[in-house]
Amino acid sequence: RFTAPPRFVFERVLAFEARVAALEAGERGGYRERHVTAALERHIAETLLASLRIEPEVAPDLVTRQAGLARRRLEERVGGASELASAARAEGISERELLGLFRRQARASLYLDRMVAPMLEPSNAELSALHRSGRTPFSGAPFESVQPGLKRWFVATRLAEALQSYYQNARSRLDIVILSLPTQGE
């Protein structure tokens, strides 16, 4: 049986990721318990995937490039860079911590792309067919003008589905322990 070292998610990081989940759902008034649950599940899946070995080894500049794309995808999902910055400020998340989050997302997405199924570079034929289906936020505009945004949206959607699937498959093998600070008098 494989045992991984313990990993910790601090409350303010989880609160930030829950705010992001709420923003992704179009809810601007804070976050709810379901957002915390979704954020925790995504965080766990990304952390597990990011820690797995990728063959052949990924070049550091590719991780950096993918982290930049992860930032862009997240900004688009939450309604822009200012929304992301506001969520980070609300929970005291520094730029360095944001970079760590994007690097974790980058490594997880690279693992999924290289070791599970290609998903970071959809073909133009896939994107065109998706655009014609009318099931995207870009369906009302000409394909050529929305192709880059459609690609980012499609990749983000595929990654979210893959992360959720990975978490659901791993869930029965995980031990999640909630730690809290002792209250006064304990």
Functional labels for PLM-detected ranges:
Residues 1-3, 136-186:
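A C-terminal, polar beta->alpha supersecondary segment
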Residues 80, 104, 112, 116-117, ...:
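Alpha-helix capping at helix-to-loop junctions
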Residues 1-106, 121-129, 145, 161:
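N-terminal targeting/tethering segments
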Residues 113-114, 118, 122-133, 166:
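Non-catalytic accessory/assembly modules
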Residues 50, 85, 112-117, 132, ...:
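Amphipathic alpha-helical segments within well-ordered protein domains
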Residues 98-99, 115-119, 138-141:
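Short acidic, glycine/proline-enriched loop segments that cap or flank alpha-helices
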